[in-house]
Swiss-Prot record:
Residues reported in the UniProt entry to bind Cu cation: 45, 47, 62, 120
Protein name per the record: Superoxide dismutase [Cu-Zn]
Biological function: Destroys radicals which are normally produced within the cells and which are toxic to biological systems.
Chain residues that bind Zn(2+): 62, 70, 79, 82
Record-linked InterPro entries: SOD-like_Cu/Zn_dom_sf (IPR036423), SOD_Cu/Zn_/chaperone (IPR024134), SOD_Cu/Zn_BS (IPR018152), SOD_Cu_Zn_dom (IPR001424)
Reactions that this protein is recorded to catalyse: 2 superoxide + 2 H(+) = H2O2 + O2
Organism: Bombyx mori
Sorted UniProt keywords: Antioxidant, Copper, Cytoplasm, Disulfide bond, Metal-binding, Oxidoreductase, Zinc
Enzyme class: oxidoreductase
Subunit structure: Homodimer.
PANTHER family assigned: SUPEROXIDE DISMUTASE CU-ZN -RELATED
Lineage, highest ranks first: Eukaryota, Metazoa, Ecdysozoa, Arthropoda, Hexapoda
Cofactor binding notes: Binds 1 copper ion per subunit.
Length: 154
């Protein structure tokens, strides 16, 4: 059954991100735009809670129902919510989001509906950086924008 979701990002930067899944076994297509990022890569993750009462910090850790180490989108071992990086080509411009991911879902136990999408200040090292935070957060820095992922009309 097809499903769609949307997330409106708010914070120091802003944007709108859409999620489309044709059926429960299909990958999720993530698309949209983020405005106001500094030039370079920025960690892009689904966090465990849809709680933004204390800004982005109340969203909890990365969505990780399998209790794995942090990794990149193509890593064999990763959090479900590890979507890697989005890259701003220029300061404060529009950054296009175009990702296809088979770990997140809009159905079942790996559903991201009601969870928070977070854009981070720094690049995600995909768990390979050797920093003490590499295996938990990708050492991606502060949370500069976030929003709750909600169901959208098909």
């Amino acid at each position: 059954m097809p499903a769609k979701a949307v997330c409106v990002l708010r914070g120091d930067v802003s944007g709108t991100v859409f999620f489309d899944q044709q059926d429960e076994k299909s990958p999720v297509v993530v698309s949209g735009e983020v405005q106001g990022l500094t030039k370079g890569k920025h960690g892009f993750h689904v966090h465990e809670f849809g709680d933004n009462t204390n800004g982005c910090t109340s969203a909890g850790a990365h969505f990780n129902p399998e209790k794995q180490d942090h990794g990149g989108p193509s890593s064999a071992v990763r959090h479900v919510g590890d979507l890697g990086n989005i890259e701003a080509i220029e300061d404060s411009g529009v950054t296009k989001v175009s990702i296809q991911d088979s770990q997140i879902s809009l159905h079942g136990p790996n559903s991201i509906i009601g969870r928070t999408l977070v854009v981070h200040a720094d690049p995600d090292d995909l768990g390979l950086g050797g920093h003490e935070l590499s295996k938990t957060t990708g050492n991606a820095g502060g949370r500069i924008a976030c929003g709750v992922i909600g169901l959208a009309k098909i």
